[in-house]
Amino acid sequence: MPALTRALRCALLAARVALAREKARRAFASHGEMLSQPAAALARLPPASVRVLVGFGAALLVSLVVLHRRPAARGAAGGGGPAEYDPAARFLALSEGANATIAADLRALTAGPHLAGTGAAAGAAARVLSGFRAAGLRTLTREYTPLLSYPGHASLALLRADRTLLAHLSLDEPADVGRRLVRPYHAYAPSGGAVAEAVFVNLGREEDYLTLERLGVSVRGRVAVAIRGGGYRGGVVRRAAERSAAAVLIAGHADGGVERGTVILGGPGDPLTPGWAATAGAERLDFDHEDVKRRFPAIPSMPVSGKTASAIIRTLGGPALPADWQTGVGLPVDVGGVGPGPTLVNFTYQEDRKMGMIQDIFAIIKGYEEPDRYVILGNHRDAWTYGAVDPNSGTSALLDIARRLGIMLQSGWTPRRTIILCSWDAEEFGMIGSTEWVEENLEDLQSKAVAYLNVDCAVQGIGLFAGSTPQLDNLLVDVTRQVKDPDVEGKTVHDTWNKMTGGINIERLARTDSDFAPFLHHAGIPCMDLYYGKEFPGYHTALDSYHWMEKHGDPLFLRHVAIVEIWGLLALRLADDPVLPFDYQTYASQLQEHANAFSSMMENSKWVHLLNRSIEDLSDAGLEFLKEAKKLQDQNISDGYSLMRRRLLNDRLLLAERSFLQADGLQGRGWFKHLMYSPPEDYESKLSFFPGVADAISRSSNRSAKEQQAAVRHEVRKISRAIQRAADVLRGEFSNRNESLYSSLSVAP
């Protein structure tokens, strides 16, 4: 009876696969529309269905004859499914007609604005949920109630020195012709106002204020007018507040557009629930709590159009505009000086803060062998305006991945590990949706998450750009060799990527501008961020529309298809490879480059020697691991013992990144825990790695050389210990390093 049962199951599987293939073929014809239930398809009895029935009978007959044979093995490429099933090839084959499907999804998602926490956001959420369900995937939703920020009343005018009105200045966005969008504003900018002289501060960087000091110009009590390009806008506002400015106006470069954005400080997530999720009944800090007050800028700010900024700047007197500022202005102005005055700026702003409901949406594909290991793909769907680039180019790509995986599931494939597709909300306010979910599930994610693959602005121009933690570099390079370049016939993405940048260039993720931040900086999960095109002039403006994408960004939507293919193949490798495709020798090489760069900045070489010893050990551990994994792969892995050994190997790979976390976080910034790639406290820091060192340097800049050396040395020791922890985890053993070896390298205070 057991043999007969197996035979019947094999026959049923064969019939199910045949039905799924017929459904997939017809799905291509309708650009991805899923068919109805198999019973309804059989009721219509087209020729293909007759073939299915015949196939079922034949399979049943053969199975009864060969009862002694075992059922079909798992697919050769690693995922569960029919024998000889290649998930990567199948995924790529589903690109036929995908550009039309992606375009249709993007058009629907961008039909109107969908700012988080507003009624208009429901439409985009419904579209994503419907897409996940149409793919046949299990879905979940999770709601949070964070503090959100919206614009109230605002006004801007130019006054003569005697405070009589010279001109009302517009705070509207010229490109928002129908006034369908939320007016331009800075989220979390406090209410306030000023009647004061203006000073042009160029990009609003520290070096710009030093230039003004040399010219004898101060912004104390005045309105600082800046041009976008000086780093994070919140950092620009904070820098002006530190110089005692009364308010800040920031002009962008988009022709007719005004760039909205958040100015919240101190990292991502809901400011009232730092470290825990903003669920409906959660504890919330008071607004007068020190941890909350330092999250908000001290002075009001507002984005303005180039035309409005020009009207202010051209009235300025004072010292002449520095020559190197003239090329960076980027505005149609005839400027005589940097200010102050002689005219006055009358600026008022009223913020509307309130608790708002946001919703994260998930689709889950459970793994057959390691269901408790998660490969996570994420994109946010909320937008400041229409969001054709930011973020819904990525949303439409995520929906296409869901469609393809759904078809593959119906063909009998199942991933080895669980795949989770995530649609985040309220990213534009400071990565709130993703951060709250990570905080709520931190322990589970730290013990089970394999990697997080992020796509935000999937397409904003030509050429692939990527950032990742270093152990994923080689995986990304391998995958790009499998994907056709969308712009150059006969070339792969790898070919053009390599040529465009003069060699493969993968940046590190020491920034907090998208949803990888909580996964890497707080949870220590390997991350990657992908996008096509480097600069988009309509960023966060009314120009971020489907019309722009169709006319300029990706007219044929083939760059979208390329991103889908790269993103999806990365997920399949991480979900299906027997041994996780991580390379910690590459990680060690990158850390060595960081150590060398740090060495060029510091005089004391003993500190660098301390780092070098740990990095060398990590490299050795990575090589030892590769040899051990190769030996296991050459053996029979069908028995339970070998499967357990492989599981233990993968766990060491999975947990090594967590070793770079400092349990209590960076000094004074406890939410950020990653000692290699958290962002530095100073937004203008020249170090994009070793954030504790960067913080120690900036905080001790006014101290004695002895004190600065002590502060930096302490952070170097932390980093060295973390790297050593990672090496020990890769080896799967307790550390046996003699602490005296480190003590001998200490520097006398």
From Swiss-Prot:
Q: Which Pfam families does this one have?
A: Peptidase_M28 (PF04389), TFR_dimer (PF04253)
Q: What membrane topology was assigned to this protein in its record?
A: Single-pass type II membrane protein
Describe the reaction catalysed, as an equation. Release of an unsubstituted, C-terminal glutamyl residue, typically from Ac-Asp-Glu or folylpoly-gamma-glutamates
List cystine links.
none
Could you say which cofactors this protein requires? Answer: Zn(2+)
Q: Which residues are glycosylated?
A: 99, 346, 612, 636, 702, 738
Q: Which InterPro entries match?
A: PA_dom_sf, Peptidase_M28, Peptidase_M28B, TFR-like_dimer_dom, TFR-like_dimer_dom_sf
Top-level taxonomic group:
Eukaryota
Q: Which UniProt keywords apply?
A: Carboxypeptidase, Cell membrane, Developmental protein, Glycoprotein, Growth regulation, Hydrolase, Membrane, Metal-binding, Metalloprotease, Protease, Signal-anchor, Transmembrane, Transmembrane helix, Zinc
The residues that hold Zn(2+) 1 are 380, 390, 456
| Cytoplasmic topological segments | 1-46
CDD domains, alphabetized: M28_PSMA_like
Extracellular side stretches: 68-749
Tissue-level expression: Expressed in developing embryos, roots, leaf blade, vegetative shoot apex, inflorescence apex and flowers.
The segments labelled Catalytic in the record are: 278-574
EC id: 3.4.17.21
Provide a GO biological process annotation. Answer: proteolysis
Active site, UniProt feature: 427 (nucleophile)
Q: Which GO terms describe its cellular component?
A: plasma membrane
Q: What does this protein do?
A: Involved in the regular timing (plastochron) of lateral organs formation. May regulate the rate of leaf initiation and the duration of vegetative phase. Seems to be redundant to the function of PLASTOCHRON1 and PLASTOCHRON2, but to act in an independent pathway. May be required for the synthesis of small signaling molecules that have a role in regulating meristem function. Involved in plant hormone homeostasis.
The name this protein carries in UniProt is: Probable glutamate carboxypeptidase PLA3
Gene designation per UniProt: PLA3
